[in-house]
Design a protein with these regions (language model features):
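Catalytic core and acceptor-binding pocket of nucleotide-sugar-dependent glycosyltransferases
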Residues: 123-210
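Residues that flank catalytic or metal-binding motifs in active/ligand-binding sites
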Residues: 3, 55, 72, 121-122, ...
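ER/Golgi luminal nucleotide-sugar-dependent glycosyltransferases, focusing on the catalytic module
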Residues: 48-50, 87, 93-121, 180-183, ...
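GT-A fold catalytic core of metal-dependent nucleotide-sugar glycosyltransferases
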Residues: 51-105
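N-terminal anchoring/stem segment of glycosyltransferases
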Residues: 1-57, 61-66, 197-225
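A short secondary-structure junction signal
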Residues: 81-82, 104-108, 135-141
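Short His-Asn-centered micro-motif
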Residues: 9-10, 41, 72-74, 80, ...
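Aromatic-acidic/polar surface patches that form glycan- and anion
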Residues: 15-22, 48-52, 115-121, 151-158
């Protein structure tokens, strides 16, 4: 039976050049894997939470008619030769070096809210089936005031909220981690072998930094995008 899937991206504000390029690239990928595509704009999940927190909209009832929902940052790109259907791949989100560090940090800072025993996913990519989305949504039964603890730029934000909801929903971390290739930073080796490339400002893991558009253009010039 053919699955009914959708790929989402989110942005709050006026789209920049790289955002538009990412949208076009991901729309092309969505067409290849037979998924719908939609850009979510503004602050539909909560008008008082930061822009990244709006990714929580992916678990709302408006998407219940879809089997899988994939949420991608708006600086993610599929390489030219990447033909793998992510909807056939196991996992929900990223849990690599950065996420492991942030997981430790959120548990240290919020020991009554966070836990080492439940999953923590990076915010650049989430892939959730309907049962998980409904479970997370159903766990959001209390006042949303606790979400304000993560309502600061670069302070857990959507990652922190999803982590707490995963705890309350009793989500087992086993099998929820995506292969790192599905969110490979642009400065890492062999970007042509990535599932999705996450365009960053760094040129190498150690730096220096430059505009993301320059790093995007370097990937285009190399024939990867």
């Amino acid at each position: 039976m053919t699955k009914n899937n959708i790929i989402l991206q989110h942005f709050d504000g006026e789209l920049r050049e790289l955002d538009k390029l990412s949208m076009a690239n991901i729309q092309e990928y969505a067409q290849m894997v037979g998924a719908e595509y939609r850009l979510i704009t503004g602050k539909p999940f909560s008008p008082v939470l930061t822009a990244p927190c709006q990714k929580l909209q992916m678990i709302q009832p408006e998407f219940d008619r879809y089997d899988d929902v994939l949420m991608l940052d708006i600086d993610m790109f599929a390489p030219k030769d990447m033909k793998i259907n992510i909807f056939n791949e196991p996992g929900v989100g990223m849990y690599h070096t950065t996420q492991k560090m942030l997981h430790r940090k959120i548990v240290q800072q919020y020991p009554l809210l966070a836990s080492n025993n439940y999953p923590y996913w990076g915010g650049a990519i989430y892939k959730m089936g309907k049962s998980l989305r409904v479970a997370l949504r159903s766990a959001d039964t209390m006042s949303k005031e606790w979400m304000n603890r993560f309502n600061k730029p670069y302070h857990f934000e959507d990652e922190g909220i999803f982590h707490v909801l995963a705890i309350r929903a009793g989500v087992n971390w086993r099998g929820t981690f995506l292969d790192p290739k599905w969110c490979q930073c642009s400065f890492l080796p062999n970007p042509q072998d990535a599932g999705f490339i996450h365009v960053r400002t760094k040129i190498t893991p150690q730096g220096p930094k430059r505009e993301k558009m320059e790093n995007y253009q370097a990937l285009v010039d190399a024939g990867i995008l």
